[in-house]
From Swiss-Prot:
Cystine residue pairs: none
GO cellular component labels: cytosol; extracellular region; ficolin-1-rich granule lumen; Golgi apparatus; nucleoplasm; secretory granule lumen
Localization terms from the record: Nucleus; Cytoplasmic vesicle
Subunit note: Component of the commander complex consisting of the CCC subcomplex and the retriever subcomplex. Component of the CCC (COMMD/CCDC22/CCDC93) subcomplex consisting of COMMD1, COMMD2, COMMD3, COMMD4, COMMD5, COMMD6, COMMD7, COMMD8, COMMD9, COMMD10, CCDC22 and CCDC93; within the complex forms a heterodimer with COMMD7. Interacts with RELB and NFKB1/p105. Interacts with CCDC22, CCDC93, SCNN1B, CUL1.
Name of the featured protein: COMM domain-containing protein 9
Function, in words: Scaffold protein in the commander complex that is essential for endosomal recycling of transmembrane cargos; the commander complex is composed of the CCC subcomplex and the retriever subcomplex. May modulate activity of cullin-RING E3 ubiquitin ligase (CRL) complexes. May down-regulate activation of NF-kappa-B. Modulates Na(+) transport in epithelial cells by regulation of apical cell surface expression of amiloride-sensitive sodium channel (ENaC) subunits.
Location of the COMM domain: 122-196
One family name in Pfam for this protein: COMMD9_HN
Matching PANTHER family: COMM DOMAIN-CONTAINING PROTEIN 9
Residues annotated with N-acetylalanine modification: A2
PROSITE patterns assigned to the protein according to its UniProt record, in alphabetical order: COMM
One Gene Ontology term from the biological process aspect of the record: cholesterol homeostasis
Organism lineage: Eukaryota, Metazoa, Chordata, Craniata, Vertebrata
Length: 198
């Protein structure tokens, strides 16, 4: 994620017109979410609370959004790391206030960003049962044990709106297929453990 430009920092200076720290805190919280940026209500609140034009409010919210996203994306968790993002000539008290507010909320924002990222469908439930499948042909009658595996899969919420789509998939596995699958899952587990321990 690209660093902030001089224009972004100039837009952030509009926060000096805020009547209280709570106004700055509220704008930081509201501007983190991408969906909130286009809301007319947020623009109107920003215009009235800071006495700025619509254009200045948009630039400020974009700058705040970019700053908070950058901190969450880079996983900056110390005041020093966040302060280093600001230019030297940036208003000292505003810089300190923004850093304090960001530190208060960065872990929540990271969790929100991770939950909202576009991803592959997720496995939400897994169930199985063992059945005896009988088959008959002219040669002999056979009873073959099989595993019926039912997986419930949730589509990415950002792609399907407010109501996440959950679908069920049922597969039938022979003992040989199940053995191969378990062997492959064991290797995946070993690789994940190796990566996690690095």
């Amino acid at each position: 994620m690209a660093a902030l430009t001089a224009e972004h920092f100039a837009a952030l200076q509009s926060l000096l017109k805020a009547s209280s720290k709570d106004v700055v805190r509220q704008l930081c919280q509201e501007s983190f979410s991408s969906s909130a940026l286009g809301l007319k209500k947020l623009l109107d609140v920003t215009c009235s609370s800071l006495s700025v034009t619509q254009e200045e409010a948009e630039e400020l919210l974009q700058a705040l959004h970019r700053l908070t996203r950058l901190v969450a994306f880079r996983d900056l968790s110390s005041a020093e790391a966040i302060l280093a993002l600001f230019p030297e000539n940036f208003h000292q008290n505003l810089k300190n206030l923004l850093t304090k507010i960001i530190l208060e909320h960065v872990s929540t924002w990271r969790t929100e960003a991770q939950a909202n990222q576009i991803s592959l469908p997720r496995l939400v439930d897994l169930d199985w049962r063992v059945d005896i499948k009988t088959s008959s042909d002219s040669i002999s009658r056979m009873a073959v044990p099989t595993c019926l595996l039912q997986m419930k899969i949730q589509e990415d919420p950002s792609l399907c709106g407010d109501k996440p789509s959950i679908s069920a998939v049922t597969v039938e596995l022979s003992k040989e297929t199940l053995d191969t699958m378990l062997d492959g899952l064991g290797r995946i587990r070993d690789q994940l453990s190796a990566v996690a321990s690095k």
